[in-house]
């Protein structure tokens, strides 16, 4: 059943107008101009939607009714650590949150345990299912990767809780340090595209380009840098790309890293396609990336967690992924959709 969301349209239109009017805001990063930083804002190297595109999308918006709540079957408690360097274990938490364990290191991507993805509980996207790992069962986290600062990927309340239990290193794009000032936490490092950080004698993380955007309000559009992460560990390269559209930058990633043991790719929030294709990949795009990067395995994320004014059904990603896998002749067991809380292991 389709539902026209009038209140969403009005609020979104007002927000967009204010974004255009108030072009100056807090500066989260000050540095020299580059191919992706100009006039105090970060930019994509490929076309974005225009203001008129946004208005057209808002005018045409039709949301699809989702279930108010989905109960998932309980999964085993995650391991405290995976000590072996020839084993990689990944556990899907929810949305873009993935627990990555190998060589005695626990890495967590874009963690969110909050009930709502937004500035306040009554103005954001509501959760429709519980995280796959209960917070009190989360192992000690060594590194947190933040792909960008949208509310569904950078959740301050969750970060505060993890800092209180684990004191992890937080890695993100340029501007993330100032963005997290409210935490009063000093173990944060910001990276430019292609900048590297070595976290162990055998482990290295590289911040890589993506095609997306950033911002949390009316005055900070694209003031911080978005991107993905390549985790280089003995078992092989792992790509966590966060939120992204399909783009030419994947060719650059392929040239630099050649091959991947695992790619973690978004496969949700992709309709209406004419508008979302410059922000979010769909399952067809994700399978193409799987093939382009010579990935041994891939894993889909960013689906069916928050009701974000979705314009596709709650299970559309599963159906469309099956179609794409058949289209590109990729075996279904090479591209996973894990249950919330489900873990898988890869060995060298």
Spans of model-derived segments:
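Catalytic core of the metallo-beta-lactamase
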Residues: 97-101, 199-260, 277, 281-285
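Active-site metal-binding motif and surrounding structural segment of the metallo-beta-lactamase
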Residues: 47, 122-172, 187, 258-264
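Divalent metal-coordination and catalytic microenvironments
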Residues: 100, 110, 148, 155, ...
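Metallo-beta-lactamase
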Residues: 4-137, 172-240, 261-268, 320-342, 346-347
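Active-site metal-binding loops of divalent metal-dependent hydrolases
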Residues: 111-113, 149, 175, 210-212, ...
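A short acidic, amphipathic alpha-helical/loop segment
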Residues: 157-162, 183-184, 249-253
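Cap/insert and terminal regions of metallo-dependent hydrolase folds
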Residues: 27-32, 36-40, 45, 135, ...
């Amino acid at each position: 059943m389709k539902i026209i969301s009038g209140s969403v349209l009005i609020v979104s239109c007002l927000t967009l107008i204010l974004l255009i009017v108030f072009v100056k805001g807090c500066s989260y990063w000050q540095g020299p101009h580059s191919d992706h930083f100009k006039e105090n804002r970060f930019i994509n190297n490929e076309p974005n939607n225009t203001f008129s595109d946004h208005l057209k999308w808002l005018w045409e918006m039709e949301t699809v009714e989702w279930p108010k709540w989905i109960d998932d079957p309980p999964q085993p408690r995650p391991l405290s650590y995976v000590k072996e360097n020839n084993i990689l274990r990944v556990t899907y938490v929810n949305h873009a949150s993935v627990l990555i364990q190998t060589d005695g290191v626990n890495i967590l991507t874009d963690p969110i345990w909050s009930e709502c993805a937004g500035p306040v509980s009554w103005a954001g996207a509501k959760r429709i299912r519980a995280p796959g790992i209960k917070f009190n069962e989360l192992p000690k986290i060594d590194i947190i990767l933040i792909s960008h600062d949208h509310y569904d990927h950078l959740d301050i309340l969750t970060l505060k809780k993890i800092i209180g239990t684990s004191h992890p290193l937080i890695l993100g794009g340029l501007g993330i340090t100032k963005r997290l000032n409210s935490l009063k936490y000093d173990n944060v490092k910001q990276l430019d595209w292609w900048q590297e950080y070595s976290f162990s004698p055998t482990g290295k993380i590289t911040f890589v380009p993506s095609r997306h955007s950033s911002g949390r309000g009316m005055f900070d559009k694209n003031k911080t840098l978005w991107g993905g992460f390549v985790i280089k560990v003995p078992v092989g390269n792992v790509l966590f790309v966060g939120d992204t559209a399909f783009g030419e930058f994947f060719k650059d990633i392929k040239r630099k890293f050649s091959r991947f043991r695992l790619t973690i790719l978004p496969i949700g929030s992709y309709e209406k396609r004419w508008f979302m294709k410059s922000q979010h990949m769909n399952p067809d795009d994700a399978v193409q990336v799987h093939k382009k990067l010579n990935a041994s395995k891939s894993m889909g994320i960013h689906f069916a967690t928050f009701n974000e004014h979705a314009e596709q059904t709650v299970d559309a990603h599963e159906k469309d992924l099956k179609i794409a896998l058949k289209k590109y002749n990729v075996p279904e067991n090479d591209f996973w959709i894990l249950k919330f809380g489900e873990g898988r292991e890869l060995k060298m």
